[in-house]
């Protein structure tokens, strides 16, 4: 009967194997604010350098003062500039998601991009195109507002209200740091390398993967792209 001594390092017990990682897109994987800044500069006919990179969630720093104003800009960005397809990749996202996937973590992409009426088809198509183009591995793609409903073991999220809501629901949530969430406490990650370390630490200390997904640990799995 094979023993650990007979196995290669990649086959030995990996505490993260079978763990479900719920990952937000905008501000975590996709550089939503960087791309929106470029589009907003075009919208306002102003140099992009005149729009600060230090923004809060509602973007009022750029002169967007009402929900209707935000909706107009957002609709233009999605329908005329393919916002969700053309946003850049946050450094490290692909590298560390693929690394986690190869270690047996099940990547569950969770986004609330369907919050505006009559943009659902564009949002879904652009999202899938972006994920494929950037080589992001995932098992599931969920468009949902109440993210705790998807049942992940660990969440990576940047929206301050989303982080608060997930934590209040008892979900272990890593806050991906940016200017919109400076008031949010630990656990925080300034980079995807830090996300990776926090996920591994959680898996090693909680045993969540072993408790919730014994079949995955026994049989393994591979994320689809």
Over which residues does each language-model region extend?
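Substrate-recognition element of Asp-dependent hydrolases with the DxDx(T/V) motif
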Residues: 84-89, 93-127
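Conserved Lys-Pro-Asp/Glu-containing loop-to-beta segment of HAD-superfamily phosphomonoesterases
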Residues: 141-167
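A short, structured active-site edge motif that brings together acidic residues
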Residues: 52-55, 108-118, 124-148
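Active-site neighborhood of HAD-like aspartate-dependent phosphohydrolases
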Residues: 2-69
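Anion (oxyanion) recognition and catalysis
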Residues: 98-102, 132, 167
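Metal-dependent phosphoesterase signature
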Residues: 48, 58-95
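A structural signal for isolated positions on well-ordered beta-strands in alpha/beta enzyme cores
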Residues: 106-108, 154, 174
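Asp-based, Mg2+/Mn2+-dependent phosphohydrolase catalytic module
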Residues: 137, 160-225
